[in-house]
C-alpha cells in the first residue's frame, strides 16, 4: 500500500546525488510507489498542539543535471500514517533540537519518524560512542585546556575535534611538543567555554576509517573504508578520502553487536558507526551516509532493506 513519505532535509537544490544517501532513500521510496513530500527548509511549525510544515509533492530522477521536480507548496499537518525521514545534517544546534521537538509531537500524533526524535536529541555523535567504552580508544571530552593538553602529552599523538562537526571539518592531529597545541585547544574550546574531544591517534587510519551501517541494530555485511589520500590524516569523503568496500571482520561485528541493540532500543533505525582499526570512534544518527557507494561497489540495495523494515512497522 502506498505510504506518504515526508522528508526533512537540507535544500535538495544543493545535493550531490551520486553520493547522497537521502536521495537514495527517496529513489527507493518512489520505486515502491510511495508518495514523496518535500518539507521546505525551516518551515516546521506548531499550532494548537499540532505540527505543520510547508510541503510540496516531490518526484526524483537519478539524473545528475535534472534530479527532482517539486509541485506547489501547501501547509500540511504531520502525523497519522506518515513516514517522516529526518535527514538534516549537523550541526545539532538549537534550531535542530526545536525541529526534533516538533517531530516528537508529530510522532505522538501517529507519524513514524526516522530516526526517533528523542534519540536525535540525546545522542551526540561523538559522546554517544562513549556509551560503549569497551569499544573505544582512550578518549577525553572536556572544556579544560590543561587536561586536554595533558591527555595529548600522555598519548603522544591525538586527534582533537569539536563535538558538533561533520565531514572532517575542524579536526586536528597534534602531538606532544606541538607548538600549535595551545592555540588548537583555545580554538576548539573557545577559551575553555566549549566542550571538545580528544582521542588517541590511531595509526590504522591509513587503512581506512570504516563506516558500518546498521538497520534496526543489524549491520550491513560490508563497510566502506574511507582511506586518507596523500599526506591527509582524515578519511572523510568530504575531506577527499577514497571509499573502498570491505566485508566486515570479526571485530567489526563484535562492535556492531555491542552498539546495535541499544540503537534499536532508542528507535535509531538507520545508524552509521565509525571504526578505525579495532576501535569505535563515532556513532552517526542524524544523517548517516555512504549508502550509495556501498550499493555501487557491492551490488546492494541498502535503502530497500531499510524500507522493508519501515513497511513492516518495525
UniProtKB/Swiss-Prot annotation:
Keywords: ATP-binding, Glutathione biosynthesis, Ligase, Magnesium, Manganese, Metal-binding, Nucleotide-binding
EC class (word): ligase
Record field: catalytic activity: gamma-L-glutamyl-L-cysteine + glycine + ATP = glutathione + ADP + phosphate + H(+)
Pathway: Sulfur metabolism; glutathione biosynthesis; glutathione from L-cysteine and L-glutamate: step 2/2
Stored Gene3D superfamilies: 3.40.50.20, ATP-grasp fold, A domain (3.30.1490.20), ATP-grasp fold, B domain (3.30.470.20)
Aminoacyl-tRNA synthetase recorded as keyword: no
All residue ranges annotated as the ATP-grasp domain in the record: 125-311
Gene Ontology MF: a single term: glutathione synthase activity
Cofactor: binding comment: Binds 1 Mg(2+) or Mn(2+) ion per subunit.
Recorded GO CC terms: cytoplasm
Cofactor(s) recorded in Swiss-Prot or TrEMBL: Mg(2+); Mn(2+)
Family, as annotated: Belongs to the prokaryotic GSH synthase family.
NCBIfam families hit by this protein: glut_syn, PRK05246.1
Protein name: Glutathione synthetase
Organism from which the protein derives: Xylella fastidiosa (strain Temecula1 / ATCC 700964)
Gene: gshB
Amino acid at each position: 500500500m502506498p505510504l506518504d513519505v515526508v522528508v526533512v532535509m537540507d535544500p535538495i537544490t544543493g545535493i550531490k546525488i551520486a553520493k547522497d544517501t537521502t536521495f537514495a532513500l527517496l529513489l527507493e521510496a518512489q520505486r515502491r510507489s510511495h508518495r514523496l513530500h518535500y518539507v521546505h527548509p525551516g518551515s516546521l511549525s506548531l499550532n494548537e498542539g499540532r505540527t505543520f510544515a510547508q510541503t510540496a509533492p516531490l518526484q526524483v530522477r537519478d539524473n545528475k543535471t535534472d534530479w527532482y521536480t517539486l509541485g506547489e507548496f501547501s501547509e500540511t499537518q504531520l502525523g497519522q500514517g506518515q513516514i517522516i525521514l529526518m535527514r538534516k545534517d549537523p550541526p545539532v544546534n538549537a534550531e535542530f533540537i526545536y525541529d526534533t521537538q516538533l517531530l516528537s509531537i508529530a510522532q505522538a500524533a501517529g507519524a513514524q519518524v526516522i530516526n526517533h526524535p528523542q534519540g536525535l536529541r540525546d545522542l551526540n555523535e561523538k559522546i554517544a560512542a562513549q556509551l560503549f567504552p569497551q569499544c573505544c580508544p582512550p578518549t577525553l571530552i572536556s572544556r579544560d585546556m590543561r587536561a586536554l593538553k595533558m591527555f595529548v602529552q600522555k598519548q603522544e599523538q591525538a586527534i582533537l575535534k569539536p563535538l558538533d562537526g561533520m565531514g572532517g571539518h575542524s579536526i586536528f592531529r597534534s602531538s606532544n611538543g606541538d607548538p600549535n597545541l595551545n592555540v588548537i585547544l583555545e580554538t576548539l574550546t573557545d577559551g575553555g567555554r566549549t566542550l571538545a574531544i580528544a582521542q588517541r591517534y590511531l595509526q590504522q587510519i591509513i587503512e581506512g576509517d570504516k563506516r558500518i551501517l546498521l538497520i534496526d541494530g543489524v549491520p550491513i555485511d560490508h563497510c566502506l573504508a574511507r582511506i586518507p589520500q596523500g599526506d591527509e590524516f582524515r578519511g572523510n569523503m568530504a575531506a577527499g578520502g577514497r571509499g573502498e568496500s570491505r566485508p566486515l571482520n570479526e571485530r567489526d561485528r563484535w562492535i556492531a553487536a555491542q552498539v546495535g541493540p541499544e540503537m534499536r532500543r532508542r528507535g535509531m533505525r538507520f545508524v552509521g558507526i565509525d571504526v578505525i582499526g579495532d576501535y569505535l570512534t563515532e556513532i552517526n544518527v542524524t544523517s548517516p551516509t555512504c549508502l550509495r557507494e556501498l550499493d555501487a561497489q557491492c551490488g546492494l540495495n541498502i535503502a530497500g532493506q531499510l524500507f522493508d523494515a519501515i513497511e513492516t512497522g518495525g
